[in-house]
Amino acid sequence: MKSNLKILLKKELYEFKYNYKAWILTIIVICFSYFPNVRKSAMRDFTILAFIILATGQYIYNSYLTDISYNGILFLKNIGIKPVYLFFIKLLFSSILTGIIMLANIPNLKGVFSFSDIFWIYPIVVFSSAIMQISAAYVNGAENTASAIAITISFSMLICIFFIQVFFLKIIFSIVITCFFVFISIKILYSKIYRIQL
């Protein structure tokens, strides 16, 4: 199992390094967040988080779409790795992208977020990853439409979170909704593997 996990990790690392769309979008997002209009905006906190969701979501979407389009799911079955491991390894790399964007935005984040905000921010990033995976699984040749719908859902959830004023409820809501969609996304991966076996 450990050797198979290493194989999967190497595969995902290779894809992560050469996912040019995600890297280009990450650079654009970082540069755009330093525009004067963005830095002085009253919605700076929402804008930065929306940028993070956009960049990490694009990475997850492209990665899953590649797996589905080029028999990556079959590869997963052949090496005997459970779909849950695939989800969390992809989440690891999307978290790295999130970290890069947040580190690059430290001057913009000062006074906007506190450390405790990570308890609801990170679940939303995970939620976005799950939504992107689900949309990639049901793309059916309409890549742009599926991606746009997934991003819209993620942004809508982010808006809902911002409307919640009680910090504790914000954390609970983000964690519960994220756990639900992570469960759904992993079940969909299992169903993909099952259909390959038929």
Please give the residue ranges for each predicted region.
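Hydrophobic alpha-helical transmembrane segments of membrane proteins
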Residues: 1-71, 87-198
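Short helix-to-coil transition segments within interhelical loops
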Residues: 77-83
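Membrane-interface interhelical connector segments
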Residues: 73-75
